[in-house]
Amino acid sequence: EAYNKALAIKPDYADAYNNMGGTLQEQGKLEEAIEAYNKALAIKPDYAEAYYNIGVTLKDQGKLEEAIEAYNKTLAIKPDYAEACYNMGITLQEQGKLEEAIEAYNKTLAIKPDYADAYNNMGRALKEQGKLEEAIKAYNKTLAIRPDNAEAYNNIGATLKEQGKLEEAMEAYNK
């Protein structure tokens, strides 16, 4: 209701449409959210955040190719948008495009070197490729940034187990 009042006063308020989209998305009204983001873009065609939000919403709907298109539009406008690079990586990884996902995570880390989750997901992609030592290095970089990251310890344990290093795996699981 507050967004509608804002738009009644200022109909070309792109931020209100973008924020309305976020609220609709949180309510699970994904199609309506995309409509709101598109209204924001009709007013402000270079609105990187609206494209990003469309990408996240499309990914939530399982429309991975369309999500990637939205992330690409985001990055064309705002090349240093770390979250768009990161979510692009996740989406590519879900499609099994591991090399492209790793490239996206590397771009994320070039923009934001302390993005722990990018290292963790890169480790998962490397593990899927069978590059177990590289995966462990990526997980350790996650832990260098966020020592309390339980998922990274679990991933290290699973990777060590896959290597047959069972005692080391148990140590990682117990951390």
Each model region followed by its residue ranges:
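Canonical positions in the second alpha-helix
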Residues: 6, 39-40, 73-74, 107-108, ...
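Short, intrinsically disordered, charge-balanced linker/junction segments flanking boundaries
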Residues: 167-175
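Conserved alpha-helical positions within TPR/SEL1-like repeat arrays
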Residues: 15-26, 49-59, 83-94, 117-127, ...
